[in-house]
UniProtKB/Swiss-Prot annotation:
Lineage: Archaea, Methanobacteriati, Methanobacteriota, Stenosarchaea group, Methanomicrobia
Motif ('HIGH' region) on chain: 116-126
A molecular function GO annotation: ATP binding
Listed EC numbers: 6.1.1.19
Predominant cellular place of this UniProt entry's protein: cytoplasm
UniProt KW Cell membrane keyword: no
Keyword Nuclease: no
Name of encoding gene: argS
Keyword annotations: Aminoacyl-tRNA synthetase, ATP-binding, Cytoplasm, Ligase, Nucleotide-binding, Protein biosynthesis
Protein name: Arginine--tRNA ligase
Pfam families: Arg_tRNA_synt_N, DALR_1, tRNA-synt_1d
GO cellular component, one term: cytoplasm
Length: 559
């Protein structure tokens, strides 16, 4: 209802003012929406904004299209307040299943996220990427878009050559119960130490890079087998966080089918190309026209391609097969992403929309796979589950161990996902163990608990007749009006690629529901008032469920 009402007011205002751009803002304590259009008209009409606002208020109040909406002038501002009809229509929509889900749109979106190098387990920095990307994908689907979520697999990088070297010369086998990605990390760290101690062995890494570029069958098979094992470990980690990819795209495939060479051939013909010379055998691009002083290297002097060359082929393929291309990448990728976008534009190919995120860390310190001093995502999840079990045990000591552990696993996922998604991508953050698991504050479990409370109220109430009127208290009205905004929040998230807005909305919804429940008796109410409030609880429960699922958090009925 909020989006429809916003659009209606915007259209009517444009019609009666002849303005092409109308900005409607939150009305704060005075109204639901407000407009400053009187300021723009004042310059044209040579009248005071206050006078214009008063005249417009009279005109708009008499407009039958705005029936049920109170229009008032407050100084130079126009205020719009929604009436009982708005509340009733919101409730009728919100008690339906799949509230907030938009009709299917004829737009195909490809969204790439995570795409971590397969040389060790995911750490907390990687899973910020995963959670941002997964939440965006869920929001796009909620908004009616067809989305394919991809993981771009780096199976030709130098890191993989080092992993292969380690398995050939240093591997002592996996430890009992050790995940494949953790095993690979141990071998990778050992191989790096061996190469640092014996620099002459670096020639073997160079040889492996030459072989994979030439698609040597034995090398290609070994690289893919090792990478696949690491990816299997990644999938287990991401499954524990409710993160899923639709498709894994291998960078070596773009070399195998010739797409990369086609791209390099096209780029060799543009004015920005810097061909190899006897002194410098690299092939690069001069991107100074885009503000980049450093050359964009695409092929090394030994003839092997670099990651950027394969990435260009991948992005051209995405741009030709999807309507929107979205990448979720760390802030450390800003330079290479900028060079990629510049290059794609030079050859008239579709550039990606990029969500850059700053790093997330733990209070214990930083993470580095190469040095072997990192906190893996698996360790983070395991520790959070232990803490969640302790919390659930205190709150529900009577439940069976199996039920306790299942609830704790969901609570742990909620704690991690919410604590990471609540911060806007461009801000760095430190993961807070205590705050993430706080049932009584602004956390994932806090929103889950509000949903479980709504379910409990409905279960205790038994059957009732839905009623959409008689909502009069300020707590009821505030809750309904917030529920009405859910579809517009989804639209804002996908338009601006700002998934943290969804977390803020969920927290505020839980706050408003808990405040309503505290001040307005539901089960102790009588007659029509009880039915109206139970209908509001049902609407809140369904909206909480939808927003939790869009956040990738389990909507538990009992905690």
């Amino acid at each position: 209802m909020f989006t429809e009402t916003y659009t209606l007011i915007e259209r009517v205002l444009k019609a009666c003012t002849d303005e092409t751009e109308i900005a409607l803002t939150d009305g704060g304590e005075h109204a639901d929406l407000a407009s400053t259009v009187a300021f723009a008209l004042a310059k044209k009409r040579h009248q005071a904004p206050k006078v214009i606002a008063e005249e417009l208020a009279v005109t708009l109040a008499a407009n039958p299209e705005l029936a049920g909406i109170r229009v008032e002038a407050l100084g130079p501002y126009l205020n719009f307040s929604f009436g009982p009809k708005y509340l009733e229509e919101t409730l009728k929509a919100a008690v339906q299943d799949n509230f907030g889900t938009a009709p299917t749109k004829p737009v195909r979106i490809v969204l790439e996220h995570t795409s971590a190098n397969p040389n060790g387990p995911l750490h907390v920095g990687h899973i910020r990427n995963s959670i941002l990307g997964d939440t965006l994908a869920r929001a796009f689907r909620k908004a009616g878009y067809r989305v394919e979520v991809q993981y771009y697999v780096n199976d030709m990088g130098r890191q993989i050559a080092i992993v292969a070297y380690g398995f050939d010369h240093l591997d002592t086998g996996a430890k009992p119960g050790e995940k494949a990605d953790h095993h690979i990390a141990r071998v990778y760290v050992a191989a790096n130490r061996d190469l640092e101690a014996n620099p002459d062995k670096g020639a073997e890494i160079d040889e492996r890079m030459q072989l994979i570029e030439k698609r040597d069958p034995a090398t290609a098979t070994q690289f893919r087998e090792l990478v696949s094992r690491c990816l299997d470990g990644f999938k287990v980690t991401m499954q524990g966080l409710n993160v899923k990819h639709d498709r894994f795209i291998w960078e070596s495939d773009f070399v195998k089918i010739g797409d990369m060479e086609k791209v390099l051939g096209r780029l060799a013909k543009i004015p920005q190309a810097v061909p190899p010379t006897e002194e410098d055998g690299t092939f690069s691009l001069d991107l100074s026209s885009c503000g980049y002083k450093k050359s964009y290297v695409l092929r090394r002097s030994d003839g092997t391609s670099v990651y950027a060359a394969r990435d260009l082929a991948y992005h051209i393929w995405k741009g030709r097969n999807f309507d929107r291309v979205i990448d979720v990448l760390g802030a450390d990728h800003k330079l290479i992403t900028g060079q990629l976008v510049c290059t794609l534009r030079l050859i008239a190919e579709k550039p990606p929309e990029v969500v850059h995120f700053e790093f997330v860390s733990l209070p214990e310190g930083s993470m580095s796979t190469r040095a072997g001093t990192f906190v893996s995502a698996d360790e983070l999840i395991e520790e959070m589950q232990k803490r969640a079990i302790e919390e659930v045990q205190v709150r529900r000591p009577e439940i069976p161990v199996e039920e306790r552990d299942a609830i704790a696993a969901s609570v742990a996922r909620a704690a991690i996902r919410y604590d990471i998604i609540k911060v806007s991508p461009e801000k760095s953050t430190v993961f807070d163990w205590k705050e993430a698991l706080d049932f009584d504050r602004q956390s994932g479990p806090y929103v889950q608990y509000a949903h479980a409370r709504a379910c409990s109220i409905l279960d205790r109430a038994g059957p009732f007749q839905e009623r959409y009127d008689l909502l009069e208290s300020p707590y009821e009205i505030a809750l309904v009006k917030h529920i009405a905004k859910f579809p517009s929040i989804i639209e804002s998230v996908v338009r601006d690629l700002r998934p943290h807005m969804l977390a803020t909305y969920a927290r505020d919804l839980a706050d408003l529901f808990n405040t309503f429940y505290h001040y307005d008796p539901v089960l102790k109410g009588e007659g029509p008032v009880r039915e109206s409030r139970l209908t509001l609880v049902l609407a809140a429960e369904k909206t909480l469920k939808e927003v939790l699922e869009t956040l990738g958090i389990d909507a538990l009925r009992s905690m």
